[in-house]
Amino acid sequence: MKYPRIGFHQQGVLLLLIALFLLTGSTALFLVVMNSNNVDQARLDRTLDALNEASDALIAYSMMYGDLYGNNGAGPGHLPCPDTDGDELEDTPCGPGAFGRIPREIVLPTADIYAVSDFNSGTDQRIWYALSNNFRADPPAVANPQIPGTLTVDGSGGYAAVLIAPGAVLAGQNRPSNLAADYLEGTNNGGAVFQSVDAGIFNDVVRGITVDELMSPVTARVAEKIGEVLQSFFDRRGNYPRTRLQFENALTGGGGGGGGGGGRGGGRGGGRGGGGGGGGGGGPGLTMPAWFTDNDWLANTVYNRLNTNTATVAFAGCNIVYTLNAGVTSIAKTSSQC
């Protein structure tokens, strides 16, 4: 008995249908995988954005610390304590190795609210926060660009703070919880050493803040405060301090403040308050806040007078040079990063 042969045309149609079926299946699989990858990438992007926003808020808080807490506060360069009890507020004071969740907000002495991060606020997936011993605001430590960070990320030291966003729950973790080990894996759940990449062990996303990153805007704020004091000196004396000693006295109020300017003013009948003679130079001028000397900024400030109304200041541990000009509120700088 002869069986009917399938013609070449029919064979081609059959093969085309099989290929189409396989292609459709593989395309569907590819779309599922691609969609999953897109979802994962979108989630990672949101997490990275949240970490960067929280980092920016902490750095801005550190830069403006002297303005937020007054002249006798810890001063610029300090960071808030973590939230250790889960109420979304910082818990002070914090001891060495401070570690907890990042505060959602900070209540200032004025009762105003400083927002830090509302990422996953009200849930157990908030960002975790490690704070270097040397940059705590309460109790205050001496903070300036020469002070090293005590935290390490991926084998590199010098971090002032580390932010960690937890991933999905893994085997052995129990949530909700107030224990770091239920959210963070390996060395990331406490201590001073952190890892940012090791998919085989954990799914945390890590963002460190280096001392240089923290101190770049902080030094700019300190330079602005120095500029205000030197402007006050210039208004009374008609020039910037000529020597290092004059510079230090101008900033701290030592040496009678203005020096010889008082005598000149007195000769004109005390028109500018100069009747007080050489001791006051027309009366006391502005001086730097207490935090300036408390944090050793004076000892680490390099002053260079260029001419009567122009000078530069720089700070040990930071390679930015700031140029101050009398009567000019803006300050030129050689770089944006230490």
What does each model-identified segment do?
Residues M1-K2, D40:
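Elongated, non-catalytic scaffold/linker segments and compositionally distinctive motifs
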Residues K2-N35:
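N-terminal single-pass transmembrane signal-anchor helix
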Residues A28-C338:
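N-terminal pilin/flagellin-like segments and related low-complexity appendage regions
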